[in-house]
Swiss-Prot record:
One of its GO terms (molecular function) is carboxyl- or carbamoyltransferase activity. Acetyl-CoA carboxylase is a heterohexamer composed of biotin carboxyl carrier protein (AccB), biotin carboxylase (AccC) and two subunits each of ACCase subunit alpha (AccA) and ACCase subunit beta (AccD). Pathway: Lipid metabolism; malonyl-CoA biosynthesis; malonyl-CoA from acetyl-CoA: step 1/1. NCBIfam families: accA (TIGR00513), AccA_sub (NF041504), PRK05724.1 (NF004344). It catalyses: N(6)-carboxybiotinyl-L-lysyl-[protein] + acetyl-CoA = N(6)-biotinyl-L-lysyl-[protein] + malonyl-CoA. This is Acetyl-coenzyme A carboxylase carboxyl transferase subunit alpha. It holds the Pfam family ACCA. Keywords: ATP-binding, Cytoplasm, Fatty acid biosynthesis, Fatty acid metabolism, Lipid biosynthesis, Lipid metabolism, Nucleotide-binding, Transferase.
Amino acid sequence: MSLNFLDFEQPIAELEAKIDSLTAVSRQDEKLDINLDEEVQRLREKSVELTRKIFSDLGAWQVAQLARHPRRPYTLDYIKHIFTDFEELAGDRAYADDKAIVGGIARLDGRPVMIIGHQKGRETKEKIRRNFGMPAPEGYRKALRLMEMASRFKLPLITFIDTPGAYPGVGAEERGQSEAIAHNLREMSRLNIPVVCTVIGEGGSGGALAIGVGDKVNMLQYSTYSVISPEGCASILWKSADKAPLAAEAMGITAPRLKELKLIDSVIPEPLGSAHRDVPAMAATLKAQLLADLKDLDGLNNEELRNRRYQRLMNYGYC
């Protein structure tokens, strides 16, 4: 699988290309008198060192690019690696089944849980089918149906957030996009079950918040959470999307900044080079965080859960 190096990763890409070239030569001609193993190992160590150096000083815009990386693991990838016995549940029982939202019942280390998450696509047809991870009202109403089911059967709710935002099309607005999001915000704050939310990629505005009101809110190290995209902000303030890097820095969209503002609980570290470099390792780290969060919440009664969740929602936008 191609790593799809980003612009700021080009020095790493060049080193990796040299490693691949030397490795290929070594495999194709085993009769070479020159042993390339030492050189390959040296370059690999240099690549790790360079990656560590570059990723130790990333700007907000570079983090935004990583959050959108085409190989970044999505909700279904984490479901595959973290949970067992997943049974997807479809439809909002009113209009349609929105593929931009996936959800269902599964087991986390043997414990039954309800999972809801945004789902983007990788190939062109899947991207269109998933609407690029931008849910319509029926997607949020499907999510609400699963939340209510989880509450009825006392299943902890785990959500994965990864969306540019709610779909802004005319049809979505006609079917009540804002009402669907608002309804979810209200009902999530009232759920009588533990709710753990994790931003795994992009956390775009109300489209993210509609499944993001939790007792614990986490972000992966290279994910983002914001009221608008950097490009959208730049277009409004400077009339040019080219100012997106400047907007990203000003908006405070990164996990460490949001942790500093007490808008999230935990920053979950990613493997060196971001989550797509080592999906199993990323999934293992995320699983450990989910288990720890549920253990913390198990000691709280329903009223305590509701109060802290509601207070978190009310604190958004206030410093």
